[in-house]
Amino acid sequence: QMLPLYGYTAVVIYKDELYVAAMYTDENDKWDPAHYNTRNLHKLVKRVQKDLPDNRLVEHLGNCSLTWHCCTAQNLFYRRWEAGIPSSPVCNANCFGCISLQPAECCPSPQSRIKFRPTPKEIAQIGIYHLETAPDAIISFGQGCEGEPSLAVDNIVPAIEKIRKKYPPTYMNLKII
């Protein structure tokens, strides 16, 4: 069976200790795995589904959180830090090793790409919802579960305009390929 495109490393037990071929490079506690996949995550996803019942992004991000264990998706439901807002189902980069779309004969993708194009209203609704209460809030476009966000600017720009009307001094991040 082919392994999905996750990060892997060698592990060895030596004198009852685990050793890995890796180097610790980031001291940002916000991405510590202990903060994610908690027992109450299902309940938090259901709460946001109830708060935003007609928003397709909530369903998509709930799946990203519960199936693929995506940290930026989970942050929406935990109402903290950086929350990703996938916006583009298409891409023009054709990256070797794309984590959201692989040819059928290749290895499985570690997450599934968004299959719809969110409306400006859906994007703005998620952004505003997150910014209302999240400490150190950031909203970002260009997640692993989407294509190239710059191909969705006709939906992202009006959404950002709505968000900026309510939250002018806001951190937004656009990751382009």
Residue ranges and their predicted role:
Residues 6-85, 102-110, 122, 129:
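N-terminal [4Fe-4S]-dependent radical SAM core
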Residues 21, 95, 151:
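Short acidic, gly/pro-rich beta-turn/loop elements at beta-sheet edges
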Residues 82, 86, 102-177:
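Core AdoMet radical
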Residues 91, 95-98, 141:
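Short cysteine clusters
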